[in-house]
Amino acid sequence: GDRKSLRVPKKPSRSLRKFLGSAPGVEVTDGKIRRLAKSLIKQEADAWSNVADIHKWVRGNVKFQAMAFRGAKFALEKKVGDCEDMTALFVALCRSSGIPSRTVWIEGHAYPEFYLEDGEGKGYWIPAQVAGPPWFGRMAEYRPILQKTDRLRDPIRRRFVRYVPQTARASGGAPRLSISRTMLTDEKPGAESQ
């Protein structure tokens, strides 16, 4: 279908609402992030064009630099960050505008996806690349996807984290730990998968 006919979900489902709030390093309610998001969204424009403007702004205004993760607020204030910071800023700007979005983790890299619906309410997770090739609406990435979210509850540390911890610690008794990775593929590129 026509990308320009896609729209922001009017009533996001419960499973989508988690992709509208803050997460570690994705400071959706920060005043500067909210003001920038408001300035980038044009009420008369279609959703695809609005998200494309967010994509262009992040790519054009935040310089890539390999560094430890500092988050969306840091990337906006300092205009510098690595793929995780740039992704966090894109995600925060989308979420602040009411557009569900999430971080996709692959080996050695992260990129954002945003969620739009067609006229019949069918939703699509759409990839974008904010650090690296300027892909928008497609992803020619060969590395396997490790995770598609940026707000998980760590049961050991009892707090929210950006991604699944790959380590654990135990005290007293014999530890029993199982970590599994399952490789999933979309049946159709852009199909909703959560």
Describe the predicted segments one by one.
Residues 50-54, 79-94:
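Active-site nucleophilic cysteine motif
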